[in-house]
């Protein structure tokens, strides 16, 4: 089982897990940023609560 984990970890070590088709290569920078977008909403919740004094 440990060997299976090591084999799978070998493939997941890169920053990008998949390559977009060539027709969509212009969207590569956007796709790289997309996983971070939910974190912005999470941080926005704290900024919003700070603006209303955490009521």
From Swiss-Prot:
One GO cellular component, as annotated: photosystem II reaction center
Superkingdom assignment: Eukaryota
This protein's UniProt keywords: Chloroplast, Membrane, Photosynthesis, Photosystem II, Plastid, Reaction center, Thylakoid, Transmembrane, Transmembrane helix
Database matches in InterPro entries: PSII_PsbK, PSII_PsbK_sf
GO biological process: photosynthesis
Cellular localization per UniProt: Plastid, Chloroplast thylakoid membrane
Proregion residues excised on maturation: 1-18
Membrane topology category: Single-pass membrane protein
Transmembrane segments: 26-46
Record text on subunit structure and interactions: PSII is composed of 1 copy each of membrane proteins PsbA, PsbB, PsbC, PsbD, PsbE, PsbF, PsbH, PsbI, PsbJ, PsbK, PsbL, PsbM, PsbT, PsbX, PsbY, PsbZ, Psb30/Ycf12, at least 3 peripheral proteins of the oxygen-evolving complex and a large number of cofactors. It forms dimeric complexes.
Family: Belongs to the PsbK family.
Protein function: One of the components of the core complex of photosystem II (PSII). PSII is a light-driven water:plastoquinone oxidoreductase that uses light energy to abstract electrons from H(2)O, generating O(2) and a proton gradient subsequently used for ATP formation. It consists of a core antenna complex that captures photons, and an electron transfer chain that converts photonic excitation into a charge separation.
HAMAP family attached to this UniProt entry: PSII_PsbK
The protein's name: Photosystem II reaction center protein K
Organism per entry: Marchantia polymorpha
